Amino acid sequence: MNTNTIKKVVATGIGAALFIIIGMLVNIPTPIPNTNIQLQYAVLALFAVIYGPGVGFFTGFIGHALKDSIQYGSPWWTWVLVSGLLGLMIGFFAKKLAIQLSGMTKKDLLLFNVVQVIANLIGWSVVAPYGDIFFYSEPASKVFAQGFLSSLVNSITIGVGGTLLLLAYAKSRPQKGSLSKD
């Protein structure tokens, strides 16, 4: 195994563990049943941007599956899949962000937030509700209400928390041209 693969496997494990812990400890209820404000999606976005789509997918998928299994006894697979897809979609745009070389510019932050809002809308407002209807025979009105609210709260969570995490990470990295030879 090369060093990059090992780094990504370790990142996936750490990301999934953080997803589980934060998801179980910070659960802010909303007026719609079985729909909570979940702060772990900010961490998922951070891992997807830093390590790419594979780590993003598996962090969300494994983290959500294990969190549901521990918390509820069994995973709700359509939502588990969407957590993975959210990490995957955000991770695909990671190379467009110059976080490793030049920090986060306003353009990078705008792109990140446009991508995460679109990914949230596709995942929670389309994939999750249709999956719930098809696989679980859930009522359409219920799952679309849950999906739209999840899109909104997860977009806000990632927009605020994910942006702050990315800014903190970018500031911790040496910037291109910041090191000079004495």
From Swiss-Prot:
Record has Transmembrane helix as a keyword: yes
One GO CC term, this protein: plasma membrane
Transmembrane feature ranges: 9-29, 42-62, 74-94, 109-129, 148-168
UniProt KW keywords: Cell membrane, Membrane, Transmembrane, Transmembrane helix
Annotated membrane topology: Multi-pass membrane protein
Keyword Cell membrane: yes
Gene3D superfamilies: 1.10.1760.20
Domain of life: Bacteria
Location in the cell: Cell membrane
InterPro entries with a match to the protein in the record: ECF_substrate-spec-like (IPR009825), UPF0397 (IPR022914)
Protein family membership: Belongs to the UPF0397 family.
HAMAP family, A to Z: UPF0397
Name by which UniProt lists this protein: UPF0397 protein SAG1634
